[in-house]
Amino acid sequence: MGKLTLLLLVLLGWLQYSLWLGKNGIHDFVRVKEDVAAQEANNSTLKARNDQLFAEIDDLNGGQEAIEERARNELGMIKPGESFYRLVPDQSRRNAGTPSTQNNAQ
């Protein structure tokens, strides 16, 4: 019975070593689990970006309004016969936030 107990203890020790330190053990499992979580986060970011791009494609295929909006905002285009006005803030309001550079002669 002593040999059987010793054999079972050796077998238990070998199984514990394989579980904790061996190939595909607990350490590898935790590392792979973290890698999977990071990849899932990356995938969700890319999926949101893809959804946004598909929505933009559908919008551009849907009509002329989206194309006109992009032409106006990104390219600065206007329709024939339109006048373009740019509103620039007053010089006094623009400089109100900056410190004054006055020289005080004494």
Swiss-Prot record:
The keyword Membrane is assigned to this record: yes
Cytoplasmic-side segments: 1-3
Keyword presence, Cell inner membrane: yes
Protein localization: Cell inner membrane
Domain of life: Bacteria
The protein's name: Cell division protein FtsB
Role summary: Essential cell division protein. May link together the upstream cell division proteins, which are predominantly cytoplasmic, with the downstream cell division proteins, which are predominantly periplasmic.
Chain segments annotated as coiled-coil in the UniProt record: 31-62
Primary localisation category: membrane
Family: Belongs to the FtsB family.
GO biological process terms on file: FtsZ-dependent cytokinesis
TM stretches of this protein: 4-21
